[in-house]
A protein has these predicted regions:
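Short, intrinsically disordered low-complexity segments
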Residues: 27-74
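Short, low-order "capping/linker" segments at domain edges
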Residues: 45-54, 58, 85-106
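Positively charged, polar, low-complexity stretches
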Residues: 18, 22-36, 99-100, 105
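Short, extreme N-terminal segment that most often corresponds to the first beta-strand
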Residues: 1-23
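Short, surface-exposed beta-strand/loop "edge" segments at domain boundaries and coil↔beta transitions
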Residues: 14-16, 60-62, 83-86
Length: 106
């Protein structure tokens, strides 16, 4: 099973988000894909963010690096499932403050 982890940031916080992203790239295996900064809300995601995509075998490592580097930002971790609403809600885990998702965009 594959997962996404989304680290959210305020539009005014782009520089710190970029630094956190670089930390993720340097501390995680190349098999963990770290996407670019997305500077707007997209789909159900309510704030700018960047996304990691990884296999289940990297779950513990990704979570540990996120906990160490997120600097108080909210992180949504969810499996990739056919039922996207369930993936983003009942099967999701938050690090930090949970944010209201725009589930009507799924």
């Amino acid at each position: 099973m594959n997962f996404h982890a989304h680290l959210f940031f305020a539009p005014s916080d782009q520089q710190t988000a970029s630094w956190i992203r670089e930390q993720m790239i340097s501390q995680l295996p190349e098999s963990v894909r770290v996407g670019p900064l997305l500077l707007r809300a997209a789909g159900p995601l309510p704030l700018p963010m960047f996304q990691l995509e990884y296999g289940e075998e990297f779950s513990q490592e990704v979570r540990q690096v996120m906990e160490n580097c997120r600097r108080g930002r909210s992180v949504l971790i969810h499996p990739l499932l056919a039922d996207e609403v369930a993936a983003h809600t009942v099967h999701a885990v938050w690090l930090g403050e949970p944010l209201p998702l725009r589930l009507d965009h799924l």
